[in-house]
């Protein structure tokens, strides 16, 4: 079942977490391309210095100011597309970046990282930007809540955003090999769960008895 618009019409950070484990689907010329979402980032409101919306409703970011449940697809580095889903109430510019996913059907490329994910599912700005995610070609399917724990951390490559760069608004499924970059603390958490190494046996002094 496709996620309804009401799913997206919530706080961006809530949606970013709730999208983990859901399935992104693109019906590309009759070919189903699908992947399970394992990593997201929230971009919340016009004051978020890491968000495109900080400059207002520019031609590029205008979709973020529109109704929730739309695809916001843009180009970075002139070569890679990134897909976001617009969230929150209309007029409050917010979106969730889909950073990585686990391949399921018809993926053309690695799905680790936002540019790779769009390439794998053949998602392109010229065809998919502004698309209603309740439509027939590009949508997110519901799925049971993930069994994996959710880890959080700062967003990637937003050092220009000052204090906003440290907000823990990146969400990922712990242990997924498809996450683009494990959030800080994930490795430490894995190490903490690992069994402790046995203590070395003390050496017996020479000449001592059994």
From Swiss-Prot:
EC number of the protein: 3.2.2.-
Uppermost EC category: hydrolase
Annotated segments matching region Disordered: 180-210
Domain of life: Bacteria
Bias (Low complexity): 186-196
This protein's UniProt keywords: DNA damage, DNA repair, Hydrolase
SUPFAM superfamilies attached to this UniProt entry: FMT C-terminal domain-like
Biased composition, class Basic residues, residue ranges: 201-210
GO MF terms, alphabetically ordered: alkylbase DNA N-glycosylase activity; DNA binding
UniProt GO BP: base-excision repair
Family the entry assigns: Belongs to the DNA glycosylase MPG family.
Entry protein name: Putative 3-methyladenine DNA glycosylase
Species the sequence originates in: Anaeromyxobacter dehalogenans (strain 2CP-1 / ATCC BAA-258)
Top-level taxonomy: Bacteria, Pseudomonadati, Myxococcota, Myxococcia, Myxococcales
């Amino acid at each position: 079942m496709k996620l309804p618009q009401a799913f997206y019409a919530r706080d961006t950070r809530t949606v970013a977490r709730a999208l983990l484990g859901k399935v992104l689907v693109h019906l590309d010329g009759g070919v189903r391309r699908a992947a399970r979402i394992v990593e997201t980032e929230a971009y919340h409101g016009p004051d978020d210095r890491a968000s495109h919306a900080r400059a207002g409703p520019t031609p590029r970011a205008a979709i973020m100011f529109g109704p929730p449940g739309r695809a916001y697809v843009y180009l970075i580095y002139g070569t890679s597309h990134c897909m976001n889903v617009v969230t929150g109430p209309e007029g409050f510019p917010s979106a969730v970046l889909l950073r990585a996913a686990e391949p399921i059907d018809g993926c053309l490329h690695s799905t680790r990282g936002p540019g790779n994910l769009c390439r794998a599912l053949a998602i392109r700005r010229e065809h998919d930007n502004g698309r209603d995610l309740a439509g027939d070609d590009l949508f997110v399917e519901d799925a049971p809540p993930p069994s994996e724990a959710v880890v959080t951390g700062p967003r990637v490559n937003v050092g220009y955003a000052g204090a906003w760069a440290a907000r823990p608004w990146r969400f990922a499924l712990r242990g997924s090999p498809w996450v683009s970059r494990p959030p800080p603390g994930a490795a430490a958490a894995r190490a903490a769960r690992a069994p402790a190494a046995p203590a070395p046996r003390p050496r017996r002094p020479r000449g001592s008895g059994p």
